[in-house]
UniProtKB/Swiss-Prot annotation:
Transport recorded as keyword: yes
Family of the protein in this entry: Belongs to the ArnE family.
A biological-process GO annotation: lipopolysaccharide biosynthetic process
HAMAP family cross-referenced by the UniProt entry: Flippase_ArnE (MF_01869)
Protein known as: Probable 4-amino-4-deoxy-L-arabinose-phosphoundecaprenol flippase subunit ArnE
Subunit organization: Heterodimer of ArnE and ArnF.
Residues on Cytoplasmic side: 1-35, 82-87
Gene: arnE
Statement: the UniProt record of this protein carries the keyword Kinase: no
Membrane-side (Periplasmic) residue stretches: 57-60, 109-111
Organism of derivation: Escherichia coli O127:H6 (strain E2348/69 / EPEC)
Keywords for the protein's UniProt record, in alphabetical order: Cell inner membrane, Cell membrane, Lipid A biosynthesis, Lipid biosynthesis, Lipid metabolism, Lipopolysaccharide biosynthesis, Membrane, Transmembrane, Transmembrane helix, Transport
Length: 111
């Protein structure tokens, strides 16, 4: 159950980052303020809930084991940026993502 909590904390943290990015995207002049407030409000809600879940994780898992798992955030954000905003990602970046996944597998397999 605690590992599921860690996954949700990671996904909520990613959602918060994506909401911040969306807040910076274009909105018409008459809707700009509402657009920014909406997306930044959602970002704060996601990041706040992620923090609460993270604290629950830290009560049950050594930080040296739990923290590296948050590296998945880099993977999720990269995938979302490509899908949502069609951001270009270099081969070097994809190699880095692969190394991150490999590192998580290595660190997670010691549990």
């Amino acid at each position: 159950m605690i590992w599921l909590t860690l996954v949700f904390a990671s996904l909520l943290s990613v959602a918060g980052q994506l909401c911040q990015k969306q807040a910076t995207c274009f909105a018409t002049v008459n809707k700009r303020r509402k657009h920014i407030v909406l997306w930044l409000g959602l970002a704060l809600a996601c990041l706040g809930l992620a923090m609460v879940l993270w604290l629950l994780v830290l009560q049950n898992v050594p930080v040296g084991i739990a923290y590296p798992m948050l590296s998945l955030n880099f993977v999720w954000v990269t995938l979302a940026a490509v899908k949502l905003w069609h951001e270009p990602v270099s081969l070097r970046h994809w190699c880095g993502v692969a190394f991150i996944i490999g590192g998580i597998v290595i660190l997670g397999s010691t549990v």
